[in-house]
Curated annotation (Swiss-Prot):
Tissue specificity as recorded in UniProt: Ubiquitous.
Alphabetic keyword roster: Chaperone, Endoplasmic reticulum, Glycoprotein, Isomerase, Rotamase, Signal
Domain PPIase cyclophilin-type residues, every copy: 50-214
Gene (name only): CYP21-1
UniProt catalytic activity: [protein]-peptidylproline (omega=180) = [protein]-peptidylproline (omega=0)
UniProt name for this protein: Peptidyl-prolyl cis-trans isomerase CYP21-1
Glycosylation-annotated residues: 158
Annotated PROSITE patterns: CSA_PPIASE_1, CSA_PPIASE_2
Amino acid sequence: MRREISFLLQPRCLLLLVALTIFLVFALFNTGKDEEKQVIEDHEITNRVFLDVDIDGQRLGRIVIGLYGTVVPKTVENFRALCTGEKGKTSSGKPLHYKGTPFHRIISGFVIQGGDIIHGDGKSSDSIYGGTFPDENFKIQHSHAGMVAMANTGPDSNGSQFFITTVKASWLEGEHVVLGKVIQGMDNVFAIEGGAGTYSGKPRKKVVIADSGEIPKDKWDEER
């Protein structure tokens, strides 16, 4: 009579199976981490801008943002120019500048949002192109805290409003154009969230961009 040997009953085979399982789990885990790292790091930073922030009239500190100008050049140019104020005024006479504007929406565990250069309450927006402009692309993901993206009222309605994530926000993919990431001052972003954030989004304190501008490349340090 032919004797059959079950694979699962052999000690050596059991050890082999366990080792193979551990190897596959480890490989899949590392692949996921590598892909996440690639999403975060593969985009070239073409410009650096800063936001100096006050809370209730007291200086909090600086947030430095690296911009992805090779991926979303039109969106980046709008944001960069609004940081410097170099484009003058809107058709209604308001400065095309983030300086002096508030973070009007601060949601605990989600985002800090600002950039309403018209009324400062989140109900209006404008751009250096005159009015709103289309979504450029959605190639960059909201992959971790510190991603900077355009706020909008629906498809192709980008203006001056933007937000900075305080968590990974993958549910926003395909709806908001990511244009950069915080490279210095993330502690200040969390301080804004913790000090003024609410679950409704209405700030508990007055948070204002006291100054903003661009950092020349010859002033960049080695940190990305």
